[in-house]
Amino acid sequence: MLRRIVNTGTKRLFRVPPRSSALCFSRRLSDQTKEVYTKINDTKDPARNQFFQYTWGSWMKNDKLERARRQTRFSIEGLSKFAKDFKPQDAALGKPEHLTNGTVALKNNWTKEILGETGHDVKSIASIHEGKHHRIYKVTLANDRQLVLRIPYRLESDYAIENKINSEVATLDFLALKLKLNVPRVLAYGPTRTNILQTPFILMEYIEGDLLMKQWNPLVPDSETSEEELKKVIDPIMEFQDKLLSVTFNRFGSLYFFDDVSAANQKVVPYDEEDNLLKDRWRIGPSTESVFSKNKKQLASQKISQFNGPWDSVEKMLKDLAEVQVESLRFRLGLAQADSSNQVEDVDQLKKQIQTFENFKIISDKLLNPSSPAIKNVEELFKPRLFVPDLDPLNVIVEQKSSKPFFIDFEHTVIKPFILASYPAFVAYQGTKLYNLEEEIPGFKDMDDVEKQQYEFMYYKTRNERLWEFALNNKRHDLIAVASPHIKLLKAPYLQVVNCKTDKDFMFIENAIIQLQAMWEAYVANQICNSTTPEFPIEYTAEYLDEHQSDLENYQLEVASTPFAATGGWVPQDMFDVLKEQNILVEDENGNYKIEADAALKNPPKDP
């Protein structure tokens, strides 16, 4: 018989009375935790369905589709059966073991410290986080040891998800074994659905503790202690990055285990390794950077594999980056022109996007000179190094028992030149820089509080980025040239490409290219860019530039005036429910939602 217990307040797991055929699972609903008991063998139990559904938000458009793409159904029976087979052993290093149940086991991590000696039956499963790319479940064993089960959303192709999981697990393995960094140990994984859990997954060590983000206050006013407070978050992340940068690789791409890359890629060693146990453990394969998979589900894996590396040169890497975007857009354009697309397409906009990426292809290998005498330590800046795109205090857990920072989430980690790496998002700032409010802003003292806050925001963001650059200079003075405004300007088109999120974001790419025109001749003269001719590589007509400027301004106005545009139309569920209850959010005949302006003015939304 099914029992439900609802608790309001602190999220927690519930213990299960001893029984051989029942399993407890719980899920977080806002500030509530629901606990449900189900029979392990009852795969059709309707009480399970909601356990797999996405609940942390809703979308203004295509809500049902977006939720369906984030459903994380897996075999509870399969997980339970797999856990029973855990046999703790010593930490002797062996190759990843492909098991008959379709999973891959890293048995060197099956230690008593992580698993305990006995009692490996699954006691409970709790949904503890629904992120942007995957969902996190906490699995509690009968001996009260806890594990993390991470399941990706179906936002990308099966090919992309398989590569992503294979690479992330190998990267975690490399960070733990080679660099001795604090990361969760992976016990097992399945890169495809053909395994006992019937879904791609990673099963890893659970780290108990608080997020480092709890200590991050980016808008803390300047004081005697403010810099020290900010550095408590910046410094451990810089320490981690410093260790990432300590290994230079032999090519560009992403890390994989030896057996997960092609025979051709197996022949190329990733870096110079002296430890015989590690020499043939990893190889460099196709890049898992998100730009090679985002919005490319329609492209066949054979087509994408022509462009996603690995590469022996930066120039080829940049050309392929442009090519994969053009190929994807041309495919979409062909479907739209043949009335075969499964979505409404703006044909004119697709053509503009293609033109922008063609422009990027022309200029990509001319942006930065790999042998520039004007760029300090340019050879070091162009060497292949690990880059983690989600280095963030949100992805750092301060372990409860040791107070050591443990780093999590290495999706889309790649090997590329440090000169092309972006700053971590929590410190990066692309706006107008302010270094001294009273000296740079006339009349600042006499402004009202609202106006002051706008300038203070710009100042604090500038300050935080500078603190990151100071930390980089202290750790890797040989790489500090990336802080140059000229380097930032020259690599801006590349960064706009890899960070492109929506179809209209191509305008930011074009704008970054256009902004180089004014300085191009000087960059050529000083040998900073990789060109010997002072003429700008792309010919823009006045008509093209005027149209681009108009389109960009309209897009920026659209983003500024459209509710939830910054989150892609995603609304936190508590807020969504409140707005809907107050008739501020209204559903139309197509199942999409819009803001009812009159209702919003009459009934301002309350805090959820």
Swiss-Prot record:
Organelle transit peptide residues: 1-21
- GO CC list: mitochondrion
Pfam families registered for this protein in UniProt: APH
Localisation: Mitochondrion
Entry keywords, A to Z? Mitochondrion, Transit peptide
| InterPro entries referenced in this protein's UniProt entry, alphabetically | Aminoglycoside_PTrfase, Kinase-like_dom_sf, Mito_inheritance_9
Question: Which family, according to the similarity comment?
Answer: Belongs to the AIM9 family.
* Protein known as: Altered inheritance of mitochondria protein 9, mitochondrial
Q: Which organism is this entry from?
A: Clavispora lusitaniae (strain ATCC 42720) (Yeast)
